[in-house]
Amino acid sequence: MFINLKNFFILIFFANLSYAEIIDISSLNHYIYTHIEYSADLEHFPANTEKDIKKRLLEKESFDQRIKFINNQPINSTIIENLLQNRNLSAITSVNHFGFTKKRSNIKMFPTNAALTYKPDDKIDRNQYSLIEPFEPVIILHTSKDGEWFFIQTFFTRGWINKNDVYNVSYNNFKRYFNTKKIVIVRDRVKMGDLIFGAGSRIPIEDEDEQYYTIIMPDSKRIRLKKDDGLSIFPVVYNSEIAKIFLESLLNQPYDWGGKNGYRDCSSLVMDLFRIFGVDLPRNSRQQAEVGDIIWERGDKKSFFIALGKAEPFCTFIHMKGHIILYGGKDKDDYLIYHAVERFGNISYNKVVKQHIISDNTNLWSKAYRITTICRSKEKRYD
């Protein structure tokens, strides 16, 4: 869907003049960093981590016995043992290193690019954790036995990344990033030089004038970009209309488990949207269900719709087992939802969709186990 950029940026401009905190970003991020497994406050990450702690992190991802194929070929015990041995557990040190991603890359469960699947030609690669955008800060915790992979901590997950996709930097240069003024990508797939940046990406800027930002690329090169080119000063103040326009622009994009092909699954759709506003949500739907205030949990149909009727659109989430849905507000006598979905009920979608809960016969109230919101209640907001 085409975004009217002029109207979109006018909306962002006036949102950024607002002082009403609909989302308490600082408190929310602090809770995520301190309570949600896999999330981390990278700005205050220590220069050293005990070896025993690193070992536990590396061993946490045991081999899933349901995985029967590697690159569509039957897997065997020798292959599994080689994958596990490449984690290099005997060479763990306490020293952490620091870096930034050079380009869009993939974070893996094991130090290999091989696809690990339950069945042949399975679209879901269990080795794929997540896409990571360019210029993301990462903590380098460990190196694989073959020397080709780094085990990293990002703000939203841990896993293995190809070492050639990471710039090593000094601790001081790493820390400087967090105190540097940044822009944020507010529409999808913005090209800068040879790199593609997805929505929510944050990029340091060196200077700006009336028409251009001078941005610092991961390789320290400088690029001048027009201010209307999908960019805004970070963070954008939360506004439901901005969220709506962004989600509408992604409708019909392919569903993509773990972002392996550069698109989104259900949880990355939610995470990327709120990164624009400065919220560092966790990466998977189960962890996202632990963030915010619970406004409904395993009730009946009537209480489900009462809760939605009172909920704030676009910062309220409906949770199913293994799935998260964004609530988009009321539409006459119905209720709108947005989600990236492979299959819903008996229908295969494989894309980002907008639906009506009632008229599209979703029966969502019988499938959901929780509704949460990350918006402040109106009495807790201030002008």
Regions found by a protein language model. Give the residues of each.
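Soluble non-cytosolic domains of exported or imported proteins
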Residues: 101, 126-129, 237-241, 260-268
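...with weaker cross-activation on analogous glycine-rich loops/strands in unrelated enzymes
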Residues: 131, 282-347
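Second-shell loop/turn segments in exported
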Residues: 122-125, 230-234, 252-261
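Sec-dependent N-terminal signal peptides
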Residues: 4-16
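Low-complexity, Gly/Ser/Thr/Pro-rich intrinsically disordered linker/tail segments
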Residues: 344-383
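Short, conserved secondary-structure segments in the cores of folded domains
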Residues: 122, 127-128, 193-195, 307-308
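Boundary regions of SH3-family modules and the immediately adjacent low-complexity/disordered segments
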Residues: 21-108, 112-114, 118-123, 133, ...
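Active-site nucleophilic cysteine motif
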Residues: 257-286
